[in-house]
From Swiss-Prot:
Gene (name only): ppk
Cofactor: Mg(2+)
Domain of life: Bacteria
Catalytic residues, chain numbering: H433
EC number: 2.7.4.1
Every PLD phosphodiesterase domain range: 428-462
Entry-linked InterPro entries: PLipase_D/transphosphatidylase (IPR001736), PP_kinase (IPR003414), PP_kinase_C_1 (IPR041108), PP_kinase_middle (IPR024953), PP_kinase_middle_dom_sf (IPR036830), PPK_C_dom2 (IPR025200), PPK_N_dom (IPR025198), PPK_N_dom_sf (IPR036832)
Transmembrane intervals: none
Protein name: Polyphosphate kinase
Key words, A-Z: ATP-binding, Kinase, Magnesium, Metal-binding, Nucleotide-binding, Phosphoprotein, Transferase
Organism: Vibrio parahaemolyticus serotype O3:K6 (strain RIMD 2210633)
Class of this enzyme: transferase
Record SUPFAM superfamilies: Phospholipase D/nuclease, PHP14-like, PPK N-terminal domain-like
Length: 696
């Protein structure tokens, strides 16, 4: 069978994932405002797709043209464009449907032509007081390099000022850095209706306010537009510049990078479109996408609560983990037994509290942590600064190349360094994506180490919407190896061996192959064999080939893949023993988990790494075995609950059809809700057991 039929192109698979996001916006069982927010998530995802994946394929085409290579990338780009345009059409239809549905609920998202007299007066007053001070039109004269001034991923209104048969053009940036995109328009007392207008439409209504007295025109019209730039940048790798300086320069390259997408309002006159393409140096019409009158739909992620609870998801407040209760501090709790947290079902506050306690605990000697993405106003980061002030030795490994978080991480690096934190940036050429924390504490004559190994970032905000595991342990074999990982980050050329952890790029590939090969050997020996895998992305061809071999040997493989999946399940003689589902629901599924049957003695690993070549071979990633039988079973149970989902699970197949898992005569199970109930029950049982012990 040809390689083309054995591997799905990752870019097309990614678009298929975003189609699943769009399915949530189309799902009438999802509360109305959540459906609108899913449109925002879809749009945000698509923006990133063009900045990264689309731009990457375009670069490959240029390289192939220079080298005289094949045109496979051209064919792929054509498929990507066709799929993206089809999804955009579905998006536009859905948006119109949701606007009508909101109107039926007495919620009106109005444009500048739908205002009554009282609203017009209020809008004009709001514009003059709040909006106009933040607007300076950019006149597109011949000598102005518009491309230099246009910001990536910002929404603009292109304005035509027409006098008889002559037109002038100007650009207005919609100032969402200073003002809300959605503005609630006051209603008359007693009216139950809610009226919302976009900032874009306030500006459109008041265009005359901006230009009158300065320009002579007969007609004035505005059209929405947005440009997406290539997100790639080159590091100078010059010895006289620090990595921090190189990264700052690299991020600045994005400000002037070439456009990879130009989205414009369909009603824009052709003459104006041609003028803009000329000014933006867009010659390839593959980059042009006609759209509606609103761009930067990602802002719809924050669509306002209109005061009607039934239009949003029912609250699922994060719960406290009972394993911490009954102890003087977090260290005693972790030392008593390993603790597993699962966000957002558990509160991330436990991690913030652990670091806060470490920052002033007189027994704590040092704290080491590696940061990939972190909240802007992170309590955890401030605790690290407090720790330095309290005389602790604090080391923070900051990944400066965390995509789209580079600027935030550069800023945090400066703040931490100024506070006296030892900030390091890791190994050249190896992005650090592991989620490690190690606290060393003097207890009597011993130094005891406490470690956190996670699947997600130390990010208070994303921990409310991403599902992720955190393992907290004082197991000496594990914590010693975590210590060695930090040593490896600081000195990647020093020989180091890991017997328990999987650490990319040292041993992850060989260990993953070993786990798969063990199941193959068991299957061939007539023993029960199985693999359960949960990752965000599976695109590494070496691992895919190994999984095909396992399927051929009779190993039953169940997978949950949220995003890109290159493996094609259900091919006779190749992958008929492989079943893949994807869950898209209110929380973003983010953990990486590997469970092997191991002839009845399951092995369970949690990991920071997706099964992509970059994560296995070109990044520092860490997977840890879960040794406590209670916690192993908990992860197995949680994973199994996903496979019972009859509401939000989609089948991954070679057609990328995104069909829902057939329910048949099974009961309705929405796995994220079922997992919340499962963990709530565990916390109740734990508290009951602790209460019984204290009563005896």
């Amino acid at each position: 069978m040809s390689a083309e039929k054995l591997y799905i192109e990752k870019e097309l698979s990614w678009l298929s994932f975003n189609e699943r996001v769009l399915q949530e916006a189309a799902d009438k069982t999802v509360p109305l405002i959540e459906r609108i927010r899913f449109l925002g998530i879809f749009s945000n995802n698509l923006d990133e797709f063009y900045k990264v994946r689309f731009a990457d394929v375009k670069r490959r085409i240029l390289i192939n043209q220079e080298r005289g290579g094949s045109d496979n990338s051209k064919r792929l780009l054509s498929k990507m464009q066709a799929k993206a345009l089809k999804l955009n059409e579905q998006f536009d239809e859905l948006y119109s449907e949701l606007i009508r549905e909101m109107a039926r609920r007495r919620i009106f998202l109005v444009n500048e032509h739908q205002l009554d007299e009282a609203q017009e007066k209020w809008i004009t007053k709001y514009f003059r007081k709040e909006v106009m001070p933040h607007i300076t039109p950019l006149l597109m004269k011949d000598e102005i390099d518009v491309l230099q001034f246009l910001k990536d991923e910002y929404a603009y209104i292109a304005v035509e000022l027409r006098k008889e048969d002559h037109s002038q053009y100007a650009l207005i940036e919609i100032p969402t850095d200073h003002l809300p995109r959605f503005v609630m328009v006051p209603e008359q007392k007693g009216k139950r209706r809610k009226t919302i207008i976009l900032l874009d439409n306030i500006i459109r209504y008041c265009l005359d306010e901006l230009f009158k007295g300065f320009f002579d025109y007969d007609e004035l019209a505005g059209y929405a537009m947005k440009m997406t730039r290539d997100a790639e940048y080159d590091l100078r790798n010059e010895i006289e510049y620090s990595l921090l300086e190189q990264m700052s320069a690299g991020v600045n390259q994005r400000l002037t990078a070439m456009p990879v997408r130009f989205v414009y309002e369909r009603e824009m006159p052709q003459e104006m479109l041609d003028f803009l393409c000329s000014k933006l140096r867009i010659s390839n019409y593959d980059n042009l996408i006609p759209g509606g009158r609103y761009h930067n739909f990602k802002d719809f992620i924050a669509f306002p609560n209109v005061g009607r609870e039934y239009l949003e998801n029912k609250p699922m407040p994060p719960m406290k983990c009972a394993d911490f209760e009954g102890y003087a501090n977090s260290f005693e709790a972790i030392k008593a037994k390993d603790i597993l947290l699962y966000y957002p079902y558990h509160t991330f506050d436990h991690i913030g509290e652990l670091v806060r306690q470490a920052s002033f605990d007189p027994k704590v000697l040092s704290i080491k942590i590696n940061i990939y993405r972190v909240a802007k106003d992170s309590r955890l980061m401030n605790s690290l600064i407090d720790a330095v002030h309290n005389g602790k030795n604090v080391t923070v490994v900051v990944e400066l190349q965390a995509r789209f978080d580079e600027e935030a991480n550069i800023e945090w690096s400066k703040v931490l360094t100024e506070a006296g934190v030892h900030v390091i940036f890791g190994a050249p050429g190896l992005k650090i994506h592991s989620k490690l924390l190690m606290i060393s504490r003097r207890e009597g004559d011993d130094i005891i180490r406490y470690a956190h190994i996670g699947t997600g970032n130390f990010h208070e905000k994303t921990a409310r919407i991403y599902t992720d595991f955190s393992l907290l342990t004082a197991d000496q074999e594990i914590t010693n190896e975590v210590r060695n990982v930090f040593g490896y980050i600081e000195n990647p050329y020093r020989p180091v061996k890991f017997n328990h952890l999987m650490v990319s790029p040292r041993n992850s590939r060989t260990q993953i192959y070993r786990l798969i090969d063990n199941e193959i050997a068991n299957a061939k020996a007539g023993k029960k064999a199985g693999l359960t895998i949960k990752v965000n992305n599976l695109v590494d061809k070496g691992i895919v080939t190994r999984l095909y071999a396992a399927s051929n040997a009779g190993v039953k493989i169940n997978m949950i893949i949220r995003g890109m999946c290159a493996l094609v399940p259900g091919i006779e003689g190749v992958s008929e023993n492989i079943r893949i589902i994807s869950i898209v629901d209110r929380f973003l599924e983010h953990p990486r988990v590997v469970i092997t049957h191991n002839d009845g003695d399951p092995q369970v690993y949690i990991s920071s790494a997706d099964w992509m070549t970059r994560n296995i071979d070109h990044r520092i990633e860490v997977a840890a075995p879960v040794r406590d039988p209670r916690l192993k079973q908990r992860i197995i149970d949680i994973t199994n609950i996903h496979f019972t989902d009859t509401v939000k699970a989609r089948l991954i197949d070679k057609e990328m059809s995104n069909s829902y898992v057939p329910r048949g005569n099974r009961k309705k199970v929405r796995s994220q809700v079922a997992i919340y109930d499962y963990l709530k029950n565990i916390e109740k049982q734990t508290r009951r057991q602790k209460s019984d012990v204290s009563d005896t």
